[in-house]
Amino acid sequence: MRDFDVIVVGGGHAGIEAAHASARMGCKTLLLTILVEQIGAASCNPAIGGLAKGHLVKEIDALGGVMGKVTDLCGLQFRTLNASKGPAVRGTRAQIDMDRYRIMMRNLCLTTPNLTVAQEMVEELIVEEGAVLGVRTQIGREYRSAKVIMTTGTFLNGLVHIGNRTSSNGRVGEPSSIKLSESLRSLGLEVGRLKTGTCARIASESIDFSVMEQHPGDLPPPPFSFSTKKEEFAPTQLPCYVTYTNEKTHEIIRSNFHRAPMFTGQIEGIGPRYCPSIEDKVNRFKERERHQIFVEPQTLEATEYYLNGLTTSMPFDVQEAMIRSMAGLQNARIVRYGYAIEYDYVNPVELKHTLETKKIKNLYLAGQINGTTGYEEAGAQGLAAGINAALSVKGEEPFVLRRDEAYLGVLIDDLVTKGTKEPYRMFTSRAEYRLLLREDNAEFRLLRHGARFGLVEEEALLALQKDEQSIHGGLVHLRESSATPSKETLAFLEEMGEEKINDKTTWLAIAGRKSFDEAKLRKISPLFEEMSERALGQVLIEAKYASYIQKQQESVGSMQEMLKVKIPEGFIFDTVPGLSLEVIEKLKRFNPPTLFAASEISGITPASLDVLHLYIHLRGKESVD
Protein backbone atom coordinates (compact mmCIF):
# COMPACT_ATOMS: atom_id res chain seq x y z
CA MET A 1 0.00 0.00 0.00
CA ARG A 2 1.38 3.41 -0.93
CA ASP A 3 1.13 6.63 1.09
CA PHE A 4 1.36 9.01 -1.87
CA ASP A 5 1.16 9.00 -5.64
CA VAL A 6 4.24 11.21 -6.03
CA ILE A 7 7.05 12.13 -3.64
CA VAL A 8 9.25 15.13 -4.43
CA VAL A 9 12.61 15.32 -2.64
CA GLY A 10 13.82 18.92 -2.31
CA GLY A 11 12.01 22.26 -2.07
CA GLY A 12 14.01 24.40 -4.48
CA HIS A 13 12.93 25.80 -7.84
CA ALA A 14 12.66 22.38 -9.49
CA GLY A 15 10.94 20.77 -6.51
CA ILE A 16 8.30 23.50 -6.22
CA GLU A 17 7.29 23.24 -9.89
CA ALA A 18 7.27 19.42 -9.75
CA ALA A 19 5.20 19.22 -6.57
CA HIS A 20 2.78 21.96 -7.61
CA ALA A 21 2.14 20.39 -11.04
CA SER A 22 1.70 16.89 -9.65
CA ALA A 23 -0.74 18.06 -6.98
CA ARG A 24 -2.71 20.28 -9.37
CA MET A 25 -3.06 17.31 -11.72
CA GLY A 26 -4.85 15.41 -8.97
CA CYS A 27 -2.02 13.30 -7.57
CA LYS A 28 -1.59 12.94 -3.82
CA THR A 29 1.85 14.54 -3.49
CA LEU A 30 4.45 14.80 -0.72
CA LEU A 31 7.20 17.42 -0.75
CA LEU A 32 10.08 16.51 1.56
CA THR A 33 12.60 19.23 2.38
CA ILE A 34 15.38 19.76 4.91
CA LEU A 35 14.02 23.15 6.06
CA VAL A 36 10.47 24.30 5.33
CA GLU A 37 11.57 27.93 5.88
CA GLN A 38 13.95 27.62 2.93
CA ILE A 39 11.45 26.40 0.33
CA GLY A 40 11.97 28.58 -2.74
CA ALA A 41 15.20 30.15 -1.48
CA ALA A 42 17.19 31.93 -4.17
CA SER A 43 20.60 30.64 -3.11
CA CYS A 44 22.67 32.67 -5.54
CA ASN A 45 21.68 35.82 -7.42
CA PRO A 46 18.49 37.83 -6.71
CA ALA A 47 17.20 37.63 -10.28
CA ILE A 48 14.92 35.55 -12.50
CA GLY A 49 15.15 35.34 -16.28
CA GLY A 50 17.63 36.82 -18.73
CA LEU A 51 18.69 35.79 -22.21
CA ALA A 52 17.19 32.35 -23.03
CA LYS A 53 16.37 31.96 -19.33
CA GLY A 54 13.47 34.38 -19.77
CA HIS A 55 12.19 32.09 -22.52
CA LEU A 56 12.15 29.20 -20.04
CA VAL A 57 10.23 31.24 -17.45
CA LYS A 58 7.63 32.20 -20.08
CA GLU A 59 7.33 28.53 -21.08
CA ILE A 60 6.94 27.45 -17.45
CA ASP A 61 4.18 30.04 -17.15
CA ALA A 62 2.39 28.94 -20.33
CA LEU A 63 2.38 25.35 -19.08
CA GLY A 64 0.86 26.36 -15.76
CA GLY A 65 3.96 26.69 -13.60
CA VAL A 66 4.42 29.30 -10.89
CA MET A 67 7.87 30.90 -11.29
CA GLY A 68 6.69 33.74 -13.56
CA LYS A 69 3.61 34.56 -11.49
CA VAL A 70 5.54 34.80 -8.22
CA THR A 71 8.31 36.83 -9.87
CA ASP A 72 5.73 39.38 -11.04
CA LEU A 73 4.41 39.64 -7.48
CA CYS A 74 7.77 40.29 -5.83
CA GLY A 75 9.95 41.78 -8.56
CA LEU A 76 12.10 44.82 -7.78
CA GLN A 77 13.09 45.69 -11.34
CA PHE A 78 11.95 44.48 -14.77
CA ARG A 79 13.89 44.83 -18.02
CA THR A 80 13.91 43.47 -21.55
CA LEU A 81 17.45 42.50 -22.50
CA ASN A 82 18.49 42.79 -26.16
CA ALA A 83 15.47 45.06 -26.72
CA SER A 84 17.11 46.60 -29.80
CA LYS A 85 17.60 43.19 -31.41
CA GLY A 86 15.15 40.80 -33.05
CA PRO A 87 12.34 39.19 -31.02
CA ALA A 88 13.97 35.75 -31.06
CA VAL A 89 16.85 36.84 -28.83
CA ARG A 90 15.12 39.29 -26.49
CA GLY A 91 14.91 38.17 -22.88
CA THR A 92 12.93 39.39 -19.89
CA ARG A 93 14.85 39.70 -16.62
CA ALA A 94 13.67 40.70 -13.16
CA GLN A 95 15.41 41.49 -9.90
CA ILE A 96 13.43 39.84 -7.11
CA ASP A 97 12.89 40.44 -3.44
CA MET A 98 14.53 37.20 -2.30
CA ASP A 99 12.72 37.16 1.04
CA ARG A 100 9.26 37.75 -0.41
CA TYR A 101 9.89 35.23 -3.21
CA ARG A 102 10.82 32.54 -0.68
CA ILE A 103 7.85 33.30 1.58
CA MET A 104 5.39 33.32 -1.33
CA MET A 105 6.70 30.02 -2.69
CA ARG A 106 6.60 28.41 0.74
CA ASN A 107 3.04 29.59 1.36
CA LEU A 108 2.02 28.39 -2.11
CA CYS A 109 3.30 24.89 -1.32
CA LEU A 110 1.65 24.85 2.10
CA THR A 111 -1.76 25.84 0.69
CA THR A 112 -1.89 23.83 -2.57
CA PRO A 113 -4.61 21.11 -2.46
CA ASN A 114 -3.29 17.52 -2.67
CA LEU A 115 0.18 18.70 -1.58
CA THR A 116 1.65 17.75 1.81
CA VAL A 117 4.89 19.37 2.99
CA ALA A 118 7.16 17.68 5.56
CA GLN A 119 10.50 18.75 7.03
CA GLU A 120 12.60 15.58 6.85
CA MET A 121 15.92 14.72 5.22
CA VAL A 122 15.71 11.80 2.81
CA GLU A 123 18.62 9.38 3.24
CA GLU A 124 17.71 6.44 1.03
CA LEU A 125 15.57 5.40 -1.91
CA ILE A 126 13.53 2.23 -1.43
CA VAL A 127 14.09 0.17 -4.57
CA GLU A 128 12.92 -3.34 -5.36
CA GLU A 129 13.26 -5.26 -8.63
CA GLY A 130 14.53 -2.21 -10.51
CA ALA A 131 11.71 0.13 -9.45
CA VAL A 132 11.58 2.83 -6.79
CA LEU A 133 8.85 2.30 -4.21
CA GLY A 134 9.46 5.25 -1.91
CA VAL A 135 12.00 6.89 0.40
CA ARG A 136 13.46 6.45 3.87
CA THR A 137 14.20 9.58 5.95
CA GLN A 138 16.77 10.51 8.60
CA ILE A 139 14.34 9.79 11.44
CA GLY A 140 13.73 6.28 10.11
CA ARG A 141 10.34 6.95 8.58
CA GLU A 142 9.35 5.32 5.30
CA TYR A 143 7.05 6.89 2.73
CA ARG A 144 5.75 4.71 -0.11
CA SER A 145 4.74 6.12 -3.47
CA ALA A 146 4.18 5.29 -7.13
CA LYS A 147 6.76 7.87 -8.30
CA VAL A 148 9.70 9.70 -6.76
CA ILE A 149 11.14 12.95 -8.17
CA MET A 150 14.61 13.95 -6.99
CA THR A 151 15.19 17.73 -7.02
CA THR A 152 18.10 17.92 -4.59
CA GLY A 153 19.98 20.94 -5.99
CA THR A 154 23.47 21.31 -4.51
CA PHE A 155 22.68 19.22 -1.43
CA LEU A 156 23.99 15.83 -2.63
CA ASN A 157 27.27 15.47 -0.75
CA GLY A 158 27.58 19.27 -0.76
CA LEU A 159 30.89 20.77 0.35
CA VAL A 160 31.27 24.54 0.94
CA HIS A 161 34.65 26.25 0.42
CA ILE A 162 35.82 29.61 1.79
CA GLY A 163 39.60 29.77 1.51
CA ASN A 164 41.14 26.62 2.97
CA ARG A 165 38.12 26.01 5.17
CA THR A 166 35.47 23.50 4.13
CA SER A 167 32.18 22.43 5.64
CA SER A 168 29.63 19.76 4.75
CA ASN A 169 26.69 21.91 3.63
CA GLY A 170 24.19 21.97 0.79
CA ARG A 171 24.01 25.73 1.29
CA VAL A 172 25.73 27.76 4.02
CA GLY A 173 23.98 26.96 7.29
CA GLU A 174 22.16 23.88 5.97
CA PRO A 175 23.39 20.26 6.10
CA SER A 176 24.30 18.32 2.97
CA SER A 177 22.75 14.96 2.11
CA ILE A 178 25.57 12.43 2.10
CA LYS A 179 23.69 9.15 2.49
CA LEU A 180 21.25 9.94 -0.33
CA SER A 181 24.18 10.45 -2.68
CA GLU A 182 25.56 7.07 -1.62
CA SER A 183 22.12 5.55 -2.26
CA LEU A 184 22.18 6.82 -5.86
CA ARG A 185 25.66 5.43 -6.45
CA SER A 186 24.62 2.04 -5.09
CA LEU A 187 21.85 1.89 -7.70
CA GLY A 188 24.44 2.01 -10.48
CA LEU A 189 23.75 5.57 -11.63
CA GLU A 190 26.73 7.50 -13.05
CA VAL A 191 27.44 10.14 -10.41
CA GLY A 192 29.88 13.00 -11.05
CA ARG A 193 31.05 16.13 -9.27
CA LEU A 194 30.32 19.76 -10.15
CA LYS A 195 30.99 23.13 -8.57
CA THR A 196 29.18 26.44 -8.41
CA GLY A 197 29.52 29.53 -6.28
CA THR A 198 28.03 32.74 -5.03
CA CYS A 199 29.06 36.33 -4.31
CA ALA A 200 29.47 38.39 -1.18
CA ARG A 201 26.56 40.50 0.12
CA ILE A 202 27.25 44.07 1.23
CA ALA A 203 25.44 46.30 3.75
CA SER A 204 23.79 49.11 1.80
CA GLU A 205 24.80 51.90 4.20
CA SER A 206 28.47 51.10 3.51
CA ILE A 207 28.16 51.64 -0.27
CA ASP A 208 28.79 54.95 -2.06
CA PHE A 209 26.31 54.73 -4.94
CA SER A 210 27.12 58.27 -6.15
CA VAL A 211 30.28 57.10 -7.96
CA MET A 212 28.57 54.14 -9.66
CA GLU A 213 26.59 53.89 -12.89
CA GLN A 214 22.85 53.61 -12.27
CA HIS A 215 20.71 51.14 -14.22
CA PRO A 216 16.93 51.70 -13.83
CA GLY A 217 14.19 49.30 -14.83
CA ASP A 218 12.11 49.60 -18.00
CA LEU A 219 8.97 51.71 -18.21
CA PRO A 220 6.49 50.23 -18.68
CA PRO A 221 7.87 47.16 -16.88
CA PRO A 222 7.56 43.85 -18.82
CA PRO A 223 5.89 41.13 -16.69
CA PHE A 224 6.64 37.42 -17.03
CA SER A 225 3.21 35.87 -16.64
CA PHE A 226 0.50 35.99 -19.29
CA SER A 227 -1.98 36.22 -16.40
CA THR A 228 -0.48 39.51 -15.19
CA LYS A 229 -2.48 42.43 -16.58
CA LYS A 230 0.04 44.75 -18.21
CA GLU A 231 -2.15 47.83 -17.86
CA GLU A 232 -2.29 47.31 -14.07
CA PHE A 233 1.31 46.16 -13.62
CA ALA A 234 3.13 48.92 -11.74
CA PRO A 235 5.65 47.42 -9.30
CA THR A 236 7.96 49.60 -7.23
CA GLN A 237 11.24 49.44 -9.14
CA LEU A 238 14.67 49.90 -7.60
CA PRO A 239 17.79 50.75 -9.61
CA CYS A 240 20.81 48.48 -9.94
CA TYR A 241 24.32 49.93 -10.04
CA VAL A 242 27.54 49.11 -11.84
CA THR A 243 31.13 49.34 -10.66
CA TYR A 244 34.31 47.74 -12.00
CA THR A 245 37.32 45.82 -10.84
CA ASN A 246 40.67 47.49 -11.54
CA GLU A 247 44.36 46.66 -11.65
CA LYS A 248 44.62 46.91 -7.86
CA THR A 249 41.75 44.42 -7.51
CA HIS A 250 43.45 42.05 -9.94
CA GLU A 251 46.79 42.32 -8.16
CA ILE A 252 45.15 41.47 -4.81
CA ILE A 253 43.57 38.40 -6.40
CA ARG A 254 46.73 37.32 -8.30
CA SER A 255 48.93 37.63 -5.23
CA ASN A 256 46.59 35.26 -3.40
CA PHE A 257 46.17 32.57 -6.08
CA HIS A 258 48.11 30.24 -3.77
CA ARG A 259 45.21 30.54 -1.28
CA ALA A 260 42.41 30.05 -3.83
CA PRO A 261 40.68 26.65 -3.41
CA MET A 262 40.12 26.31 -7.15
CA PHE A 263 43.88 26.63 -7.82
CA THR A 264 45.26 24.65 -4.88
CA GLY A 265 43.48 21.43 -5.86
CA GLN A 266 41.08 21.71 -2.94
CA ILE A 267 38.11 21.98 -5.34
CA GLU A 268 37.81 19.05 -7.75
CA GLY A 269 34.36 19.70 -9.23
CA ILE A 270 34.00 21.43 -12.61
CA GLY A 271 32.49 24.92 -12.43
CA PRO A 272 30.16 26.76 -14.82
CA ARG A 273 32.00 27.83 -17.99
CA TYR A 274 29.82 30.90 -18.54
CA CYS A 275 29.71 32.14 -14.95
CA PRO A 276 33.32 31.82 -13.73
CA SER A 277 34.58 33.05 -10.38
CA ILE A 278 36.43 36.36 -10.27
CA GLU A 279 39.73 34.59 -9.56
CA ASP A 280 39.15 32.41 -12.62
CA LYS A 281 38.36 35.48 -14.76
CA VAL A 282 41.50 37.29 -13.62
CA ASN A 283 43.57 34.17 -14.36
CA ARG A 284 42.02 33.37 -17.76
CA PHE A 285 41.58 36.88 -19.14
CA LYS A 286 44.92 38.46 -18.28
CA GLU A 287 44.51 41.12 -20.97
CA ARG A 288 41.32 42.52 -19.39
CA GLU A 289 41.94 45.71 -17.41
CA ARG A 290 38.60 45.54 -15.63
CA HIS A 291 35.50 43.38 -15.14
CA GLN A 292 31.97 44.71 -14.75
CA ILE A 293 30.29 44.17 -11.37
CA PHE A 294 26.52 44.66 -10.96
CA VAL A 295 25.45 45.88 -7.52
CA GLU A 296 21.92 44.52 -7.08
CA PRO A 297 19.34 44.93 -4.28
CA GLN A 298 18.19 41.72 -2.59
CA THR A 299 14.97 43.01 -1.02
CA LEU A 300 12.56 45.92 -1.27
CA GLU A 301 14.14 47.41 1.87
CA ALA A 302 17.51 47.21 0.06
CA THR A 303 19.55 46.66 3.21
CA GLU A 304 21.87 44.21 1.40
CA TYR A 305 23.32 44.30 -2.10
CA TYR A 306 24.59 41.39 -4.15
CA LEU A 307 27.83 41.82 -6.15
CA ASN A 308 26.89 40.05 -9.37
CA GLY A 309 30.03 39.09 -11.31
CA LEU A 310 32.19 38.65 -8.22
CA THR A 311 31.61 34.98 -7.44
CA THR A 312 34.50 33.80 -5.27
CA SER A 313 35.74 31.24 -2.76
CA MET A 314 38.82 33.26 -1.73
CA PRO A 315 39.60 33.59 2.02
CA PHE A 316 37.55 36.21 3.86
CA ASP A 317 40.44 38.68 4.19
CA VAL A 318 41.10 38.54 0.43
CA GLN A 319 37.39 39.07 -0.26
CA GLU A 320 37.42 42.17 1.94
CA ALA A 321 40.54 43.59 0.28
CA MET A 322 39.43 43.04 -3.31
CA ILE A 323 35.92 44.40 -2.71
CA ARG A 324 37.25 47.53 -0.99
CA SER A 325 39.57 48.20 -3.93
CA MET A 326 36.60 49.06 -6.20
CA ALA A 327 34.91 52.43 -6.70
CA GLY A 328 32.02 52.95 -4.30
CA LEU A 329 32.99 49.97 -2.15
CA GLN A 330 36.01 51.40 -0.31
CA ASN A 331 34.11 51.22 3.00
CA ALA A 332 32.09 48.11 2.17
CA ARG A 333 30.93 46.00 5.08
CA ILE A 334 30.44 42.38 4.10
CA VAL A 335 27.31 40.86 5.61
CA ARG A 336 27.81 37.43 3.99
CA TYR A 337 30.95 36.15 2.33
CA GLY A 338 31.03 34.52 -1.08
CA TYR A 339 31.71 30.80 -1.26
CA ALA A 340 32.04 27.88 -3.66
CA ILE A 341 30.12 24.66 -3.30
CA GLU A 342 30.89 21.24 -4.74
CA TYR A 343 28.08 18.73 -5.11
CA ASP A 344 27.23 15.41 -6.73
CA TYR A 345 25.10 15.13 -9.85
CA VAL A 346 23.86 12.32 -12.08
CA ASN A 347 24.99 12.33 -15.70
CA PRO A 348 21.71 13.05 -17.53
CA VAL A 349 22.40 10.42 -20.21
CA GLU A 350 20.95 8.15 -17.51
CA LEU A 351 17.52 9.71 -18.25
CA LYS A 352 14.73 9.27 -20.75
CA HIS A 353 13.19 12.38 -22.34
CA THR A 354 10.49 12.19 -19.64
CA LEU A 355 13.29 12.69 -17.04
CA GLU A 356 12.64 9.20 -15.67
CA THR A 357 15.85 7.24 -15.12
CA LYS A 358 16.51 4.38 -17.52
CA LYS A 359 17.85 2.05 -14.84
CA ILE A 360 15.34 2.66 -12.05
CA LYS A 361 11.69 2.67 -13.02
CA ASN A 362 9.45 5.43 -11.59
CA LEU A 363 12.44 7.53 -10.46
CA TYR A 364 12.64 11.03 -11.99
CA LEU A 365 15.44 13.60 -11.68
CA ALA A 366 15.15 17.36 -12.23
CA GLY A 367 17.29 20.46 -11.73
CA GLN A 368 20.92 20.69 -10.67
CA ILE A 369 21.04 16.96 -9.99
CA ASN A 370 20.99 16.66 -13.81
CA GLY A 371 24.02 18.92 -14.22
CA THR A 372 22.27 22.19 -15.03
CA THR A 373 22.85 25.61 -13.51
CA GLY A 374 20.23 28.31 -12.98
CA TYR A 375 16.84 28.71 -11.32
CA GLU A 376 15.05 28.76 -14.68
CA GLU A 377 16.61 25.57 -16.04
CA ALA A 378 15.75 23.86 -12.75
CA GLY A 379 12.16 25.10 -12.65
CA ALA A 380 11.52 24.02 -16.25
CA GLN A 381 12.83 20.51 -15.59
CA GLY A 382 10.87 20.25 -12.36
CA LEU A 383 7.66 21.12 -14.18
CA ALA A 384 8.36 18.54 -16.90
CA ALA A 385 9.15 15.85 -14.33
CA GLY A 386 6.06 16.66 -12.26
CA ILE A 387 3.78 16.53 -15.30
CA ASN A 388 5.27 13.25 -16.52
CA ALA A 389 5.14 11.60 -13.11
CA ALA A 390 1.47 12.57 -12.76
CA LEU A 391 0.64 11.38 -16.28
CA SER A 392 2.33 8.06 -15.57
CA VAL A 393 0.35 7.64 -12.33
CA LYS A 394 -2.81 8.14 -14.39
CA GLY A 395 -1.68 5.71 -17.07
CA GLU A 396 -1.59 8.45 -19.72
CA GLU A 397 0.91 9.11 -22.52
CA PRO A 398 4.10 10.95 -21.50
CA PHE A 399 4.72 14.62 -22.27
CA VAL A 400 7.83 15.22 -24.38
CA LEU A 401 8.45 18.47 -26.24
CA ARG A 402 10.51 18.53 -29.43
CA ARG A 403 13.39 20.92 -30.08
CA ASP A 404 11.19 22.94 -32.45
CA GLU A 405 8.42 23.29 -29.85
CA ALA A 406 10.14 24.81 -26.83
CA TYR A 407 13.40 25.77 -25.17
CA LEU A 408 12.37 23.18 -22.59
CA GLY A 409 12.50 20.62 -25.41
CA VAL A 410 15.99 21.80 -26.37
CA LEU A 411 17.15 21.72 -22.74
CA ILE A 412 15.98 18.18 -22.05
CA ASP A 413 17.09 16.84 -25.43
CA ASP A 414 20.58 18.29 -24.96
CA LEU A 415 20.86 16.77 -21.49
CA VAL A 416 19.63 13.25 -22.23
CA THR A 417 21.33 12.83 -25.62
CA LYS A 418 24.66 14.57 -24.97
CA GLY A 419 25.02 14.47 -21.20
CA THR A 420 27.18 17.09 -19.53
CA LYS A 421 30.50 17.21 -17.73
CA GLU A 422 30.09 20.84 -16.64
CA PRO A 423 27.13 22.91 -15.40
CA TYR A 424 24.76 23.32 -18.36
CA ARG A 425 23.26 26.74 -19.02
CA MET A 426 20.62 27.62 -21.62
CA PHE A 427 21.48 30.02 -24.48
CA THR A 428 19.42 31.11 -27.47
CA SER A 429 22.24 29.75 -29.65
CA ARG A 430 21.43 26.21 -28.50
CA ALA A 431 18.02 26.39 -30.22
CA GLU A 432 18.14 25.71 -33.97
CA TYR A 433 14.60 27.03 -34.40
CA ARG A 434 14.84 30.07 -32.14
CA LEU A 435 12.78 32.30 -34.43
CA LEU A 436 9.87 29.93 -33.78
CA LEU A 437 10.61 29.79 -30.03
CA ARG A 438 10.28 33.43 -29.04
CA GLU A 439 9.30 34.69 -25.60
CA ASP A 440 6.30 36.48 -27.08
CA ASN A 441 4.69 33.32 -28.51
CA ALA A 442 5.22 30.98 -25.53
CA GLU A 443 1.48 30.89 -24.76
CA PHE A 444 0.61 30.13 -28.38
CA ARG A 445 3.07 27.25 -28.36
CA LEU A 446 2.36 25.70 -24.98
CA LEU A 447 -0.75 26.96 -23.20
CA ARG A 448 -2.93 24.25 -24.75
CA HIS A 449 -0.79 21.62 -23.03
CA GLY A 450 -1.12 23.42 -19.70
CA ALA A 451 -4.90 23.54 -20.12
CA ARG A 452 -5.00 19.85 -21.07
CA PHE A 453 -3.18 18.96 -17.85
CA GLY A 454 -5.52 21.12 -15.76
CA LEU A 455 -2.72 23.55 -14.87
CA VAL A 456 -4.12 26.50 -16.84
CA GLU A 457 -7.64 27.88 -16.45
CA GLU A 458 -10.21 27.37 -19.22
CA GLU A 459 -10.70 31.14 -19.41
CA ALA A 460 -7.07 31.60 -20.47
CA LEU A 461 -7.45 28.99 -23.20
CA LEU A 462 -10.58 30.68 -24.57
CA ALA A 463 -8.78 34.05 -24.66
CA LEU A 464 -5.88 32.41 -26.50
CA GLN A 465 -8.18 30.84 -29.08
CA LYS A 466 -9.85 34.21 -29.66
CA ASP A 467 -6.44 35.81 -30.23
CA GLU A 468 -5.42 33.02 -32.61
CA GLN A 469 -8.50 33.71 -34.72
CA SER A 470 -7.68 37.43 -34.70
CA ILE A 471 -4.08 36.78 -35.75
CA HIS A 472 -5.15 34.50 -38.59
CA GLY A 473 -7.69 37.06 -39.81
CA GLY A 474 -5.20 39.89 -39.53
CA LEU A 475 -2.50 38.09 -41.53
CA VAL A 476 -4.99 37.08 -44.23
CA HIS A 477 -6.07 40.72 -44.49
CA LEU A 478 -2.46 41.93 -44.82
CA ARG A 479 -1.60 39.32 -47.45
CA GLU A 480 -4.72 39.78 -49.56
CA SER A 481 -5.12 43.56 -49.43
CA SER A 482 -2.85 45.94 -51.29
CA ALA A 483 -2.10 49.63 -51.37
CA THR A 484 -1.73 51.54 -54.61
CA PRO A 485 0.27 54.77 -54.95
CA SER A 486 -2.90 56.86 -55.03
CA LYS A 487 -3.03 60.37 -53.64
CA GLU A 488 -5.01 59.18 -50.60
CA THR A 489 -2.65 56.28 -49.85
CA LEU A 490 0.49 58.40 -50.18
CA ALA A 491 -1.02 61.00 -47.85
CA PHE A 492 -1.92 58.24 -45.39
CA LEU A 493 1.63 56.85 -45.44
CA GLU A 494 3.11 60.34 -45.05
CA GLU A 495 0.83 61.01 -42.08
CA MET A 496 2.22 57.88 -40.41
CA GLY A 497 5.80 58.87 -41.21
CA GLU A 498 6.24 56.03 -43.69
CA GLU A 499 8.07 56.11 -47.00
CA LYS A 500 5.88 56.34 -50.09
CA ILE A 501 5.30 53.42 -52.46
CA ASN A 502 5.79 53.54 -56.23
CA ASP A 503 3.89 50.40 -57.18
CA LYS A 504 1.02 48.29 -55.94
CA THR A 505 2.23 46.81 -52.63
CA THR A 506 0.66 44.37 -50.17
CA TRP A 507 -0.02 45.72 -46.72
CA LEU A 508 1.99 42.72 -45.45
CA ALA A 509 5.09 44.19 -47.09
CA ILE A 510 4.37 47.64 -45.67
CA ALA A 511 3.70 46.25 -42.18
CA GLY A 512 6.96 44.33 -42.47
CA ARG A 513 9.00 47.53 -42.54
CA LYS A 514 11.30 48.10 -39.56
CA SER A 515 9.65 51.47 -38.89
CA PHE A 516 6.12 50.04 -38.76
CA ASP A 517 4.75 49.57 -35.24
CA GLU A 518 1.55 48.51 -33.47
CA ALA A 519 0.10 52.04 -33.45
CA LYS A 520 0.42 52.29 -37.24
CA LEU A 521 -0.99 48.79 -37.71
CA ARG A 522 -4.14 49.77 -35.82
CA LYS A 523 -4.76 52.56 -38.36
CA ILE A 524 -4.86 50.23 -41.37
CA SER A 525 -8.21 48.63 -40.61
CA PRO A 526 -10.90 48.40 -37.90
CA LEU A 527 -9.86 44.74 -37.73
CA PHE A 528 -6.64 45.79 -35.98
CA GLU A 529 -8.26 48.48 -33.84
CA GLU A 530 -10.28 45.83 -32.02
CA MET A 531 -7.41 43.36 -31.67
CA SER A 532 -5.77 42.62 -28.29
CA GLU A 533 -2.24 43.87 -27.70
CA ARG A 534 -0.97 40.27 -27.60
CA ALA A 535 -2.56 39.37 -30.95
CA LEU A 536 -1.45 42.63 -32.58
CA GLY A 537 2.14 41.98 -31.52
CA GLN A 538 2.06 38.54 -33.11
CA VAL A 539 0.68 39.90 -36.39
CA LEU A 540 3.45 42.50 -36.57
CA ILE A 541 6.23 39.98 -35.84
CA GLU A 542 4.80 37.55 -38.40
CA ALA A 543 4.74 40.37 -40.95
CA LYS A 544 8.30 41.50 -40.28
CA TYR A 545 9.86 38.02 -40.26
CA ALA A 546 7.47 36.18 -42.60
CA SER A 547 10.10 34.72 -44.95
CA TYR A 548 12.46 33.70 -42.13
CA ILE A 549 9.67 32.09 -40.12
CA GLN A 550 8.52 30.19 -43.21
CA LYS A 551 12.05 28.88 -43.81
CA GLN A 552 12.32 27.61 -40.23
CA GLN A 553 8.90 25.98 -40.45
CA GLU A 554 9.98 24.25 -43.67
CA SER A 555 13.17 23.14 -41.94
CA VAL A 556 11.13 21.64 -39.10
CA GLY A 557 8.95 19.82 -41.63
CA SER A 558 12.03 18.44 -43.38
CA MET A 559 13.45 17.25 -40.06
CA GLN A 560 10.20 15.48 -39.16
CA GLU A 561 10.18 13.76 -42.56
CA MET A 562 13.83 12.85 -42.21
CA LEU A 563 13.23 11.13 -38.88
CA LYS A 564 10.78 8.77 -40.60
CA VAL A 565 13.54 7.45 -42.89
CA LYS A 566 14.32 3.76 -42.39
CA ILE A 567 17.89 2.58 -41.97
CA PRO A 568 18.46 -0.40 -44.32
CA GLU A 569 18.83 -3.78 -42.62
CA GLY A 570 22.47 -4.77 -42.25
CA PHE A 571 23.61 -1.17 -42.78
CA ILE A 572 27.38 -0.78 -42.24
CA PHE A 573 27.84 2.40 -40.21
CA ASP A 574 31.66 2.29 -40.49
CA THR A 575 31.39 3.24 -44.16
CA VAL A 576 29.70 6.60 -43.48
CA PRO A 577 32.24 9.44 -43.87
CA GLY A 578 31.91 12.30 -41.41
CA LEU A 579 30.67 10.28 -38.41
CA SER A 580 32.84 10.24 -35.29
CA LEU A 581 34.07 6.94 -33.88
CA GLU A 582 31.87 7.48 -30.81
CA VAL A 583 28.74 7.91 -32.96
CA ILE A 584 29.60 4.87 -35.11
CA GLU A 585 30.16 2.75 -32.01
CA LYS A 586 26.76 3.72 -30.56
CA LEU A 587 24.92 3.14 -33.84
CA LYS A 588 26.50 -0.31 -34.17
CA ARG A 589 25.62 -1.18 -30.59
CA PHE A 590 21.94 -0.17 -30.79
CA ASN A 591 21.39 -0.81 -34.54
CA PRO A 592 18.39 1.60 -34.80
CA PRO A 593 15.76 0.75 -37.47
CA THR A 594 14.98 4.42 -38.29
CA LEU A 595 16.61 7.83 -38.02
CA PHE A 596 14.09 8.66 -35.30
CA ALA A 597 15.30 5.67 -33.27
CA ALA A 598 18.87 6.85 -33.90
CA SER A 599 17.96 10.33 -32.63
CA GLU A 600 16.87 8.80 -29.31
CA ILE A 601 20.34 7.38 -28.67
CA SER A 602 22.42 9.37 -26.20
CA GLY A 603 25.20 11.26 -27.99
CA ILE A 604 23.70 11.18 -31.50
CA THR A 605 23.61 14.83 -32.58
CA PRO A 606 21.39 16.49 -35.22
CA ALA A 607 24.55 16.94 -37.33
CA SER A 608 25.22 13.18 -37.17
CA LEU A 609 21.65 12.50 -38.29
CA ASP A 610 22.07 14.86 -41.25
CA VAL A 611 25.23 13.03 -42.36
CA LEU A 612 23.58 9.63 -41.95
CA HIS A 613 20.45 10.74 -43.81
CA LEU A 614 22.46 12.09 -46.73
CA TYR A 615 24.49 8.87 -46.99
CA ILE A 616 21.37 6.66 -46.90
CA HIS A 617 19.80 8.87 -49.59
CA LEU A 618 22.89 8.64 -51.83
CA ARG A 619 23.12 4.87 -51.31
CA GLY A 620 19.48 4.57 -52.33
CA LYS A 621 20.08 6.54 -55.53
CA GLU A 622 23.12 4.40 -56.38
CA SER A 623 21.13 1.17 -55.99
CA VAL A 624 18.40 2.52 -58.29
CA ASP A 625 20.94 3.60 -60.91
From Swiss-Prot:
GO terms for molecular function: flavin adenine dinucleotide binding. It is found in: Cytoplasm. FAD binds at G10, G11, G12, H13, A14, G15, V122, S177, Q368. Keywords: Cytoplasm, FAD, Flavoprotein, NAD, tRNA processing. NAD(+) binds at residues 271-285. Homodimer. Heterotetramer of two MnmE and two MnmG subunits. PANTHER family: GLUCOSE INHIBITED DIVISION PROTEIN A (PTHR11806), PROTEIN MTO1 HOMOLOG, MITOCHONDRIAL (PTHR11806:SF0). This is tRNA uridine 5-carboxymethylaminomethyl modification enzyme MnmG. It comes from Wolinella succinogenes (strain ATCC 29543 / DSM 1740 / CCUG 13145 / JCM 31913 / LMG 7466 / NCTC 11488 / FDC 602W) (Vibrio succinogenes).
